[in-house]
């Protein structure tokens, strides 16, 4: 009987070791945050440099005329109303 109990204990031990060494299934909800962080920093750096290049290029393709200043846009009638002649 002692040999049968030894065989059962040995068999249970072998089964435990075999189950422990079984390859783990890939968990789809495990993320690699280090790669995600590095990728985000690279994209942020590229967008930052692109923004600086756009600002420094001084090319704005806007629809309004950029050559008009605030002084030229004033009406001459408004300037006449506030002249010193009315005092």
UniProtKB/Swiss-Prot annotation:
Membrane topology of the entry: Single-pass type I membrane protein
Chain positions found as Phosphoserine: 75, 83
Keyword Methyltransferase: no
Compartments in which it is found: Cell membrane, Sarcolemma; Apical cell membrane; Membrane, Caveola; Cell membrane, Sarcolemma, T-tubule
Gene3D superfamilies named in the record: Single helix bin (1.20.5.780)
Positions of modified residues (S-glutathionyl cysteine): 62
One Pfam family from the record: ATP1G1_PLM_MAT8
Keyword Cytoplasm: no
GO terms classed as biological process: negative regulation of protein glutathionylation; positive regulation of sodium ion export across plasma membrane; potassium ion transport; sodium ion transport
Entry GO terms, CC: apical plasma membrane; caveola; intercalated disc; sarcolemma; sodium:potassium-exchanging ATPase complex; T-tubule
Residue intervals on the Extracellular side: 21-35
UniProt signal peptide: 1-20
Residue spans, topological domain Cytoplasmic: 57-87
Entries under CDD domains matching the protein: FXYD1 (cd20317)
Swiss-Prot/TrEMBL keywords: Cell membrane, Glutathionylation, Ion transport, Lipoprotein, Membrane, Palmitate, Phosphoprotein, Potassium, Potassium transport, Signal, Sodium, Sodium transport, Sodium/potassium transport, Transmembrane, Transmembrane helix, Transport
Recorded GO MF terms: sodium channel regulator activity; transmembrane transporter binding
Transmembrane feature ranges: 36-56
Modification after translation: Major plasma membrane substrate for cAMP-dependent protein kinase (PKA) and protein kinase C (PKC) in several different tissues. Phosphorylated in response to insulin and adrenergic stimulation. Phosphorylation at Ser-83 stimulates sodium/potassium-transporting ATPase activity while the unphosphorylated form inhibits sodium/potassium-transporting ATPase activity. Phosphorylation increases tetramerization, decreases binding to ATP1A1 and reduces inhibition of ATP1A1 activity. Phosphorylation at Ser-75 leads to greatly reduced interaction with ATP1A1, ATP1A2 and ATP1A3.
Lipidation (S-palmitoyl cysteine): 60, 62
Subunit structure: Homotetramer. Monomer. Regulatory subunit of the sodium/potassium-transporting ATPase (NKA) which is composed of a catalytic alpha subunit, a non-catalytic beta subunit and an additional regulatory subunit. The monomeric form associates with NKA while the oligomeric form does not. Interacts with the catalytic alpha-1 subunit ATP1A1. Also interacts with the catalytic alpha-2 and alpha-3 subunits ATP1A2 and ATP1A3. Very little interaction with ATP1A1, ATP1A2 or ATP1A3 when phosphorylated at Ser-83. Interacts with the non-catalytic beta-1 subunit ATP1B1.
Purpose of the protein: Associates with and regulates the activity of the sodium/potassium-transporting ATPase (NKA) which transports Na(+) out of the cell and K(+) into the cell. Inhibits NKA activity in its unphosphorylated state and stimulates activity when phosphorylated. Reduces glutathionylation of the NKA beta-1 subunit ATP1B1, thus reversing glutathionylation-mediated inhibition of ATP1B1. Contributes to female sexual development by maintaining the excitability of neurons which secrete gonadotropin-releasing hormone.
Domain notes for this protein: The cytoplasmic domain is sufficient to regulate sodium/potassium-transporting ATPase activity.
PANTHER family: PHOSPHOLEMMAN (PTHR14132:SF12), SODIUM/POTASSIUM-TRANSPORTING ATPASE SUBUNIT GAMMA (PTHR14132)
Record-stated family: Belongs to the FXYD family.
Listed name of the protein: Phospholemman
Species assigned in the record: Sus scrofa
């Amino acid at each position: 009987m002692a040999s049968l109990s030894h065989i059962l204990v040995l068999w249970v031990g072998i089964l435990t070791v075999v189950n422990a060494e079984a390859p783990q299934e890939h968990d789809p909800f495990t993320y690699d945050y280090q790669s995600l962080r590095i990728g985000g920093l690279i994209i942020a750096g590229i967008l930052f440099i692109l923004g600086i290049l756009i600002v420094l290029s001084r090319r704005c393709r806007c629809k309004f005329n950029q050559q008009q200043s605030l002084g030229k846009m004033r009406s001459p009638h408004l300037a006449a109303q506030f002249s010193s002649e009315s005092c």
